[in-house]
Structure formats: C-alpha cells, structure tokens
C-alpha cells in the first residue's frame, strides 16, 4: 500500500482560542495594511478573551502603541461600528473589547498624553469623527440598548474613557453630548439598585471634569434634577453600595459580639459538634488585619463623589436622601447606611491617603447637610436604627434604643477625632470634624432643641484633643492652618459652655462640662501658653475657659481644706453652688462660621476625583 501523502502534525502543548491569534496579528504586526472586512467580522464574532487581550496590551509600551497606531485606529473605528450595529453577539463583544483596550491604552505613560492618545485611538485628522461616533454609540446603547447587559457594558466603556482620559481634553466630547438623561433613565429602570453604582460613578466623574476651569453642563443637570422616583432609586443604590462597603470592614473584624447560645458555649469548651455549631472562622493576625484595612474601602467607594455632587447642588435630593425609607429592612434608611459606612471609614481614615480622601468627601457632604437649616432640623428629628463602628478602642457607650441622626453624627465626629490622632495631624480632617460639631451645636442652640445625647463623651473627647494638641505642640505648630483649627475648637467648647442651657437636655449635662473643665484645668493653661492664645482672636474664648476652670478649681480647693477627700457627687454639688459666684463676659461671634465654598477646597476635590478615576478603572476590569 502506498504511503499516505497526509502527515500527522504534532499535538501542541496548549490550545488557545482563535481570537488570541487575531489579537497578536493585529497588535504585533507592524505593517500599515488595512485589515479586510472579513477579519473584523470574525474578530467581533469571536468571544473576547479579556485576560489574554489585557496581557498582550500590558506587554506593549506607549511607544509600541504609537508604532502600531494605524491598527489601533482601525480597531477603534470598527469596534464603534460593531458596537452600534445591534447585531448579536458582535455588539456585545465589541463593547467588551473596547473596555479592555481603552482601559489599558489610557493607563500608559505618554510623553504628550493628549496628542499621543489621540494618535493611538483615532489619528489627529479623524479625532472629531471617531469620538463623536463613540459618544453617540455609547449614549444610544445606554439609553436604548436592547438588553440591560448591553446598557451596562456601554456604561463600562464610558467609564474607561472618563477615568482614563480625565486629565486630557478628550472628555470634552462627553460634555458636548449630554449623557445625564440616559444615565438617570437607566438608573430608574434597573431592578437591582447595586447595579446603579457604575452609572452613578460615571455621572459623578463627568460632573467633576474641569468644573473649576470651564462651564460643565453636568453641574446644571445635577442641580436641576427633580424626578423623585429616580432620586429614590439613586438613594436606594447609595444605600446598597454603602452596606456592601461597610460589610467589607466587618468581614475583616466583626465588631458586633455574637449573642449567647448553647452552641457557642459548647464550642468554647471544644464540644461544638454536639450542638451542630459551625466551626469558628479563623481570626486574622494583627498584621493581616492592618493590611486588609489598608485596602479599604473597595472601588465602589467612588460613588461617594456622586453623592457629594448631588448634596451640594440639589436640595431636593438632600431632603429625599434624609427622608427616604426602605420597607422591610431592619436598618431602613439610605442616610443611615451612608452614615454607618462613614463611621467605619472614619475609624480607619489614617491608614491610607485614599481612605483619608474619601473621609474628606463624606465630611464635605455631611457639612453641607448640617448647614442647610431644613435638613439640620430633619437630622435632629429623624430617629432610625444605625450601626456605628466599634472596631477600635476607645469605644463610645452602646445605646440600645434608636437615636436621632444628629446624635449619631456627633458620635461619628467624636470617633473620627479619637482615632486619627497623629503627630502629622490631618488638619483638614479635624477642621471638618470640629466644624461640623460647631454647626450642629449652633443649630441646636438657636433652635433651642434639647438633644438627648451622652454629652459628657463629647466634652471628654474635645478636651482630650486639647491635651493632645498641648503635648505635641512642637510637632503640630508648624502645620498649615493649625491655628484655624484651634480657633474653631476653642469656640466650640466655649459656645457649649455659654449656651449649653439652650440645648442640653438636663442640668447634669451642663454641670458636666464645668466638671470636665476643672479636670482638664492644667491642660487648658498649658494649651493657652503653648499656642500663645492669651492674645489674638482666640484670646477672649480661651480666657473664658481658663477663668471657669480656675473659678471652680478654687472653690474645690477651698472645700478640700475642710474635707480631706471629695467624692464626684460633692464636686458636682460645689459646681452647682458655684454658678452664683461665676461671672462670664458675653462673647459674640462664637456661633459664627462660614458657609461651605467649594472653590476653597478645589485642590482636595481634584485629588479625590483622580482617586475616584482610579477606582473606576479597577471597577470595570
């Protein structure tokens, strides 16, 4: 028998999908020939291999992309065409490929970012045509995509461009075509509120693009948006996202003690199997916990920028954000879940610059709500269940009953003050905390609302902060705006002392502030001397505190001459009797504070926007 002309080829060590060959053929081929239409038809019919595509692009430097820019331009142009074709699965595959490609290409380091990126994606001659087609295709898919899956993939592509090209002029094309109606309609139609995080993040990034340098139409859109149904959907999305973000902290360290059970008791002595108890989850080491906490919050935290934009620009949104409730849930309010997550964030804000920036944006948001008289009133009247972080000592007392939002906010500010003390103090963080407390106390005083709260914890924390500032004065005095922080802090304590009768719920709360001033008397004097507070704009307020402390200290010292040891009850009695001989000069302007001005925080807001861009890129891949 004659030998067959067919020969058996050796079996390859590994098989790879056909699309991987096309990736290499497209991006490693240096010739400038146009790929035939059949190539592109096959390319977008094949299911993308995101991992291989991403790795291939990672291996290319910016200069390599410029060398194959002709093929990159062809890819982008054809991907836009197929993404808008409405033909399945080519449209979905094209969007997936665009997501990977744009994320990788826009993350490269270019010598001339704007012009080089334009050269890679479209070419200088065709940039208007290509990008106008891109934004039109994305907007159409977001607003009227045939499936939610297509709509969300279009959002991801837009997020890639918005986050990757944030520092270039390319986002101008996104401001020329208004995506806001499409994004809001998509959010309204989504069944799962958690899915709305990406459209919301996209809206927030677009609203922050060059907003301090030029007119941004998304700013107006945020301010004018009044569709209550969609606003409620947005609030629910914020609620769900904040629950997810908070649960990531809890997964590292569960700060709610497990209730007693027979199974738990048997497990404690090694007999848990008898009660069918689940085996204990291994507890991470302290170093492991530190590393995990440093990674928090997750990338979904970029949505906090959008929350800020809505609260600052739109009073109707703020009212619904505070007043919306979710039926059938134990913790039933978007604002409660937002504040709950913030409380966890504040206890760990010092762990990374990213966490600090997100803490700042949430404090900007809370400050804006507190400054609005109607919202502040709601905060003082609305009572909801709210879980506050108890992951780090010192811990505030556990309150079994539901409390007002205002009381919870004060707790959060105290926690933030107590848990972020460092020699390299984040002065901006503390100015925001103390400023929010000053605004709340001012509102309570003027509205004569007697807020039920453990006020002694506030006095203790504020005066402990004074002691910290005194001990580390040499390290802290050179810090930028430290004097402004001290001025606000002293005014807050003095205002609480002089106006306490108008907002404290009982006489014991008022007595306690005098008691604490006596207790911290030596620290107050040292504090005044360390920061030269006997002169300047803070002098009058500081002198009141020192005078009150000295007045009661002298009375107590006089009694000690008669009685060897005084009990706390006897000291309190002396303080009450001392009111008759205490004279305090009225100090005007203690309740004065400036309304929030966004322009004063321009540099910080730009940094936060860049951080949100980085999180957006991490979110889509």
Segments (PLM) and residue ranges:
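Long amphipathic alpha-helical scaffold regions
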Residues: 2-252
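Core helices of alpha-solenoid repeat scaffolds
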Residues: 16-19, 68-76, 123-135, 172-181, ...
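Short, flexible coil/linker elements and helix-boundary hinge sites characteristic
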Residues: 27-28, 270, 583
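Helix-loop junctions that connect tandem helical modules in alpha-solenoid scaffolds
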Residues: 29, 77-92, 136-149, 182-193, ...
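HEAT-repeat alpha-solenoid elements in large eukaryotic scaffold proteins
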Residues: 30-59, 88-120, 148-164, 203-219, ...
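Residue-level detector of extended alpha-helical repeat arrays and alpha-solenoid scaffolds
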Residues: 91, 151, 196, 300-303, ...
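Alpha-helical repeat/alpha-solenoid scaffolds of the HEAT/ARM/MIF4G superfamily
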Residues: 107, 111-115, 167-392
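Eukaryotic scaffolding regions of large macromolecular assemblies
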Residues: 340-343, 350, 356-621
């Amino acid at each position: 028998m004659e030998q067959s002309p067919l020969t058996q080829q050796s079996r390859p060590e590994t098989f790879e999908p056909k699309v991987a060959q096309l990736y290499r053929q497209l991006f490693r081929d240096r010739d400038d020939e146009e790929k035939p239409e059949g190539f592109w038809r096959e390319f977008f019919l094949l299911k993308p291999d995101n991992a291989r595509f991403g790795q291939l692009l990672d291996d290319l430097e910016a200069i390599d992309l410029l060398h194959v820019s002709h093929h990159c331009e062809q890819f982008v142009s054809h991907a836009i065409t197929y993404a808008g074709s409405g033909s399945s699965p080519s449209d979905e595959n094209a969007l997936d490929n665009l997501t990977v490609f744009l994320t990788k290409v826009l993350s490269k380091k270019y010598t001339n970012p704007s012009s080089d990126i334009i050269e890679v994606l479209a070419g200088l001659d065709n940039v208007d045509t290509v990008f106008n087609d891109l934004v039109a295709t994305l907007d159409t898919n977001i607003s009227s995509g045939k499936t939610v899956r297509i709509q969300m993939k279009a959002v991801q592509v837009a997020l890639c461009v918005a986050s990757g090209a944030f520092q270039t002029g390319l986002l101008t094309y996104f401001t020329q075509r208004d995506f806001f109606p499409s994004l809001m309609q998509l959010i309204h139609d989504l069944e799962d509120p958690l899915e709305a995080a990406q459209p919301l993040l996209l809206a927030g990034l677009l609203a922050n693009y060059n907003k301090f340098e030029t007119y941004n139409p998304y700013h107006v859109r945020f301010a004018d948006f009044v569709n209550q149904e969609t606003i409620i959907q947005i609030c629910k999305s914020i609620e769900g996202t904040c629950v997810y973000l908070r649960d990531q902290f809890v997964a590292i360290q569960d700060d709610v003690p497990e209730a007693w059970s027979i199974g738990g008791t048997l497990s404690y002595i090694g007999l848990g199997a008898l009660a069918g108890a689940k085996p204990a989850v291994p507890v991470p080491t302290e170093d492991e916990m530190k590393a995990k906490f440093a990674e928090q919050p997750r990338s979904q935290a970029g949505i906090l920028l959008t929350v800020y934009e809505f609260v600052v620009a739109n009073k109707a949104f703020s009212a619904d954000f505070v007043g919306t409730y979710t039926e059938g849930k134990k913790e039933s309010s978007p604002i409660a879940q937002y504040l709950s997550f913030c409380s966890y964030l504040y206890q760990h804000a010092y762990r990374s610059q990213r966490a600090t920036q997100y803490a700042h944006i949430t404090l900007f948001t809370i400050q804006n709500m507190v400054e609005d008289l109607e919202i502040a009133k709601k905060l003082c009247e609305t009572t909801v269940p709210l879980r506050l972080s108890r992951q780090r000592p010192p811990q505030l007392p556990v309150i079994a009953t539901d409390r007002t939002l205002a009381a919870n906010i004060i707790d959060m500010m105290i926690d933030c003050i107590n848990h972020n003390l460092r020699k390299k103090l984040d002065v901006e963080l503390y100015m925001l905390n103390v400023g929010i407390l000053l605004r709340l106390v001012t509102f309570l005083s003027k509205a004569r609302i007697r807020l039920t709260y453990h006020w002694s914890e506030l006095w203790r924390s504020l005066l402990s902060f004074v002691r910290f500032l005194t001990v580390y004065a040499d390290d802290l005095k050179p810090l930028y705006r430290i004097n402004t922080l001290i001025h606000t802090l002293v005014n807050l304590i003095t205002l609480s002392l002089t106006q306490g009768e108008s907002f404290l719920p009982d006489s014991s709360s008022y007595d306690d502030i005098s008691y604490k001033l006596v207790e911290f008397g030596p620290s107050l004097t040292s504090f005044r001397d360390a920061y030269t507070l006997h002169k300047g704009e803070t002098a009058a307020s500081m002198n009141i505190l020192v005078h009150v402390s000295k007045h009661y200290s002298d009375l107590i010292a006089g009694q000690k001459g008669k009685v060897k040891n005084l009990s706390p009850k006897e000291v309190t009695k002396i303080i009450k009797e001392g009111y008759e001989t205490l004279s305090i000069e009225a100090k005007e302007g203690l309740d004065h504070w400036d309304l929030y001005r966004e322009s004063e925080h321009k540099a910080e807001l730009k940094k936060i926007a860049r951080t949100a861009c980085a999180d957006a890129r991490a979110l889509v891949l």
